[in-house]
């Protein structure tokens, strides 16, 4: 799988306008042009599974442009595609002269904010179980400066430029699959997997649609989708320790449940991961193997291969706790 959510770069740029001496100059309104620089770059599957179909971080039709004054108050909003599109550059004219900065956001069903600060708050709102296509992406230009003038209907307006990088704020964690092999009696059909501590100390429980028919079967949550969560990056590290319990179906021996405790992750170079970054998706495959589970069912010792996907793509390996005193 390639990139997941690559950040979109929106550039408020220069419009090719004629600046003729006989035209009228009007400083009470202005023009701004926005170019989506990498809107054609493929990212990753639109579902939460490991499909190969790619999609972009945000299509032009998803983006709303917030034109704001110096204080950040939004004085006008327009859809990105409402601008004049010339080879990917969207030009907006006759904007209020109070416009000093621009925000670009995929609202994903949210109401248009009254300020850029409110837009940033929407962007940072935790949507733990939202799918990738429903995560808000946002960026702002900061204070812009006049670069030139732009001729519109025989009138020259001031042309301002700035740069806006539109990107996801969250870091994302996806459990792609659980592999159950030889869990007791050679076959360990199961009906439920419970995940603890990932969502800020809470519990997530998934009742599986299909019980495993063989010890080599692979289980995923729902219809081939991953278990996935979106965190504010400063909170992600607090969710490093994860307990996963597989619950037996018709299990006849003494231990009806098997538990894995993940207490760390490594990248593809074997280095510990201590922080999780915005715009990154961390993908993980978890094997439940009888040989890796302690007889007391308290701790295990397993290295699990993990793949990091980006909104940028990485590869990580969870490490598991084996010391019951820690």
PLM regions and their residue ranges:
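A short, Gly/Thr-enriched small/hydrophobic beta-strand-prone motif that recurs across taxa
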Residues: 21-45, 166-180
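Extracellular beta-sheet/turn segments enriched in Thr/Pro/Gly and aliphatic residues
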Residues: 124-168, 176-178, 261-326
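C-terminal motif of bacterial Sec signal peptides marking the signal peptidase cleavage site
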Residues: 15-16
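Sec-dependent N-terminal signal peptides
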Residues: 4-12
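Positively charged n-region of N-terminal signal peptides that target proteins for export
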Residues: 1-4, 19
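Short loop/turn segments at strand-loop or loop-helix junctions that form parts
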Residues: 35-39, 105-109, 139
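Tryptophan-paired
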Residues: 42-120, 152, 172-280, 312, ...
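Intrinsic-disorder/low-complexity, polar/charged segments enriched in Ser/Thr/Lys/Arg/Asp/Glu/Gln
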Residues: 29-33, 87-89, 159-161, 172, ...
């Amino acid at each position: 799988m390639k990139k997941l959510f690559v950040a979109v770069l929106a550039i408020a740029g220069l419009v090719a306008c004629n600046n003729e001496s006989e035209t009228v100059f009007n400083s009470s309104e202005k023009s701004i042009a926005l170019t989506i620089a990498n809107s054609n770059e493929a990212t990753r599957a639109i579902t939460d599974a490991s499909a190969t179909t790619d999609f972009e971080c945000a299509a032009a039709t998803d983006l709303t442009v917030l034109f704001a004054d110096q204080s950040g108050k939004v004085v006008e909003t327009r859809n990105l595609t409402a601008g004049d599109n010339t080879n990917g550059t969207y030009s907006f004219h006759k904007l209020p002269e109070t416009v000093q900065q621009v925000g670009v956001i995929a609202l994903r069903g949210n109401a248009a904010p009254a300020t850029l600060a409110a837009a940033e708050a929407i962007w940072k709102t935790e949507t733990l179980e939202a799918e990738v296509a429903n995560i808000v992406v946002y960026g702002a230009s900061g204070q812009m400066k006049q670069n030139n003038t732009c001729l519109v209907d025989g009138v020259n307006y001031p042309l301002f430029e700035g740069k806006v990088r539109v990107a996801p704020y969250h870091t994302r964690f996806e459990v792609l699959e659980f592999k159950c092999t030889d869990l007791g009696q050679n076959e360990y059909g199961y009906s439920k997997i419970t995940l603890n501590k990932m969502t800020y100390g809470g519990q997530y429980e998934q009742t599986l649609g299909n019980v495993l028919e063989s010890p080599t079967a692979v289980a995923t949550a729902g219809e081939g989708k991953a278990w996935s969560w979106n965190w504010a990056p400063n909170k992600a590290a607090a969710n490093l320790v994860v307990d996963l319990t597989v619950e037996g179906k018709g299990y006849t021996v003494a231990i009806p449940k098997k538990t894995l405790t993940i207490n760390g992750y490594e990248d593809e170079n074997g280095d510990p991961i201590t922080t999780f970054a915005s715009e990154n998706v961390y993908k993980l495959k978890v094997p439940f193997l009888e040989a890796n589970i302690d007889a007391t069912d308290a701790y295990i010792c397993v290295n699990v291969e993990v793949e990091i996907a980006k909104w940028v793509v990485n590869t990580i390996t969870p490490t598991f706790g084996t010391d019951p005193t820690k």
